[in-house]
Amino acid sequence: MKTEIQEIVTRLDQQSNKGEGGESMKWLFRPLLQMLAGGESVTIEDMATTTGKPVEEVKKVLQSLPSVEIDEQGRVVGLGLTLIPTPHHFTVDGKQLYAWCALDTLIFPALIGRSVNIESPCHSTGEPIRLNVEPDHIVSVEPSTAVVSIVTPDDMSSIRTAFCNEVHFFSSPNAAEDWLDQHPGGKVLSVEDAFELGRLMGTRYEESRPANGSCCDI
């Protein structure tokens, strides 16, 4: 299974580098998630300050992202982690946030460095699936038989359309059978294996550092 997970990571990384945001996501994504985890929309100026990038560069990257969610004031309200309700409830430090897909809920605790409670319906039966996830491990999963669907699309120019919209929780492998029949190239992973997949995928994103480069920037 470790080999299979690594193959999925390699495939998704290759497509992500050519897809939405490309290499820019490596410096933008993690700091943006950490700011969104505070439960408030994020300004371009705040992103520039946090990443140490010029405002115009941040603005240009955001304008190139077809999936990013921006409010009427031009502030970011969602990119993977979102303030806009989805089926994937993501509660961090008492704040109710949401994620675009099942795998996001498993990737983001490590990227934001927080313990998270997750609730999401089985895509087939509607049965609630509840998890408590720490940055480095899964504390609990109910039901224990839950699995996560995974796809590896060729075109990631819109990550939400191509990937996120097909990545769901199912209450059991049996509950995912119809989805697998409809997605011949798809797979289902145990929650533990999906967490490991997410951990490996998350390593492509840089740690945020102060804009003045004073910490560990030698």
Swiss-Prot record:
Keyword entries, A-Z: Lyase, Mercuric resistance, Mercury, Transposable element
Catalyzed reactions: an alkylmercury + H(+) = an alkane + Hg(2+)
GO biological process, one term: response to mercury ion
Highest taxon listed in the record's lineage: Bacteria
Any GO molecular function: alkylmercury lyase activity
EC number(s) per entry: 4.99.1.2
Signal peptide: none
HAMAP family on file: MerB
Family per record: Belongs to the MerB family.
Described purpose of this protein according to its UniProt entry: Cleaves the carbon-mercury bond of organomercurials such as phenylmercuric acetate. One product is Hg(2+), which is subsequently detoxified by the mercuric reductase.
Protein name: Alkylmercury lyase
Organism the protein comes from: Bacillus cereus
Lineage: Bacteria, Bacillati, Bacillota, Bacilli, Bacillales
Gene behind this protein: merB1
